[in-house]
Amino acid sequence: IGQSLVFAILAPLGREVGLREVQITSIIAVSALVFALASPHWGRLSDRVGRRPVMITGLVGYTVGTLIFTSVFYLGLHGVLAGTTLYLVALLARCGQSLIMSGTNPSATAYAADNTSRGERTRTMAKLGTANSMGMILGPAVSGALATFGLLAPLYFAAMLAACAAILVWRQLPLTPEDQLTPRSQLRRLRFTDPRLRLFIVSAVGLFIGFSGIQQTLGFQLQDKLSLTGIATAQMTGAALMVSAAFTFLVQVTVMQRLKLEPGSFVRIGLVSLLCGAATIAGFNDFGTLAVGMAFLGTGLGLCMPAISAGASLAVSTEEQGGAAGLIAACPALGFTVGPVVAGALYQIAPPLAPLFSAAVFYIVLVNLVIATRRQ
């Protein structure tokens, strides 16, 4: 919920304090790079010390980081910070937050892998994805409602939710038994170039380069094409993201639970859906057409990510689950490092170029996956 709140509100909030489109998208991109670099380390640490302490650390880091990030924009709205100073302080705050919160995702994914059989791995990852989808559905809806109280209200709410989640994990999640922990001397450092994981990593990074390019320019597209105010933009962006998340949720509770396909098959079908969505969004002039495009995007994301997580988990040993989860958790962040910056720059040249760039990325990933699968 918290992340989708931020994505829905950041574009209009950034414009409200005088930041340019490239500055706004670069805050996401640079902090995503920090997230990507830190995630594998947190994943390996969860193999050594257990899932619960790493998960709690990530959630507490998200809580504190969000409060600091929100305070920076509060100062910007009241004229205390402005221009380059505001941009640099906001960037630093977001990067610090990303450094710590990146422990949550790999530890949660590894915990799910610890407690499921190989035959049920894809379905289990889909269930974990369903929880993410519920957050993506609720987040934009909550963001739109809270935006009526001001553009900062959704961010304070996100911090409160993360704090509650940290308490819940501390109270309810059991510690990892000592005999299931991997000593430091036995930890194997997985790399992004590991041949067992390479195809999954390339596909996931490409997927999120394209998806983030659309997501992070969506607010600009809506505000400029439909002539919306800042608050109305936040509400409409939230509604569009909610459509996407709703279809992700539906796919994960129906298709992913009933069809027994190989992970690669799910990914190929999902990429076709993502390609259709990006092409539709490139030509929208009303919210109805945009909603259709977002539905395609949500469907594609719902098919791809659980399959990629499951495929990577099945490709490694029990002792490497945390490391593999950390690498896969870094992939969305790596995508967000590239996608928003390139799409933001293209948007300033011509708005339709941003989603067309995403469509081109989805097509390249799909072709690469088909060729690699045939070789195997």
Where are these regions (language model features)?
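Short amphipathic helix-loop junctions that connect adjacent transmembrane helices
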Residues: 8-22, 216-236
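Juxtamembrane intracellular "pre-TM" segments in multi-pass secondary transporters
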Residues: 174-202
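Cytoplasmic helix-loop-helix junction between adjacent transmembrane helices
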Residues: 93-132
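Hydrophobic core of transmembrane alpha-helices in multi-pass small-molecule transporters
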Residues: 78-103, 289-303
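C-terminal ends and interior cores of transmembrane alpha-helices
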Residues: 60-83, 273-285
